Design a protein with these regions (language model features):
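Gly/Ser/Thr-rich helix-start
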Residues: 9-13, 17, 138, 162-163, ...
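Glycine-rich loop(s) and the adjacent beta-strand/alpha-helix scaffold that form part
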Residues: 144-147, 151-220
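Conserved N-terminal/central alpha/beta ligand/cofactor-binding core
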Residues: 6-7, 12-118
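Residue-level marker for beta-strand->alpha-helix junctions and adjacent short loops that shape enzyme
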Residues: 6, 25, 126, 145, ...
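Helical element adjacent to the flavin cofactor pocket in flavoenzyme catalytic cores
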Residues: 96-154, 190-199
Length: 222
């Protein structure tokens, strides 16, 4: 279910870099690296007060699987240049997709369709359906404004992006003074956060606005 007219989201307007260790690109360049060191270096990106809120177990998991994920992306036709330096990483790990981030959308959309995935655009989820404490589907409004439901055999994945353009959520968790800053993606409304909370989920670290967690258009004032 895609709420916009076409897939893409913030990824579609991003730079498209993918940071990973132990990749084939590093090996070709003669770079000796490890997923363990990658996880250690990642802990130095955020200020200490934010790093204290981080989850080292999740970080190590993602670091450990980053090279395999890059291989998987390339198996679907995506191409990368690099790696290039990205301090405070101690080794060059930034792989940049070519020609740009829209390649992610085009290639993965094609791969999904080949697997029989049906992508409904202008279909906005409005509610998670639950049964005995388990999420079993979603309710959504289609492009005609009609309310429909879809049930799942396995689960529901919330891939809805951040909340940089939801003034209410920002005011609620960050406090006043930030809610009027324009987000770079007008469709980043935190829909997934809202749906999850309505279904009983607990929202964590919603006050963190450092770095890529929330992306804002630069202000003219300094």
């Amino acid at each position: 279910l895609e709420s916009c007219r076409q897939p893409g989201g913030t990824t579609g307007i991003a730079v498209g870099s993918f940071t990973a260790a132990e990749t084939s690109h590093q090996q070709v360049a003669g770079i000796v690296d490890s997923a363990e060191q990658h996880a250690i270096d990642l802990a130095h990106f955020a200020p200490d007060e934010i790093e204290q809120k981080n989850n080292p177990v999740s970080r190590e998991f993602f670091s450990r699987h980053s090279a395999d994920t890059l291989d998987w992306l390339e198996s679907h036709g995506l191409r990368f240049v690099g790696p290039v330096a990205e301090p405070p990483n101690k080794q060059p790990r930034m792989h940049n997709v070519i020609p740009g981030a829209k390649a992610y959308i085009a290639r993965l959309q094609l791969a999904a369709r080949k697997q029989g995935v049906v992508i409904q655009t202008q279909a906005t989820a409005s509610k998670l359906l639950t049964e005995e404490g388990r999420v079993v589907g979603a309710e959504y409004r289609n492009h005609l404004g009609q309310t429909q439901q879809v049930l799942t055999r396995v689960g529901v994945i919330l891939a809805t992006g951040d909340y940089a353009n939801n003034q209410e959520l920002i005011r609620r968790f960050k406090g006043g003074g930030y809610e009027c800053i324009e987000g770079i993606n007008p469709h980043a409304q935190g829909l997934g956060h809202i749906l999850a909370e309505q279904a009983g989920a607990k929202l964590l670290n919603m006050d963190v606005t450092y770095g890529p967690e929330l992306r804002f258009v630069a202000t003219a004032k300094r």
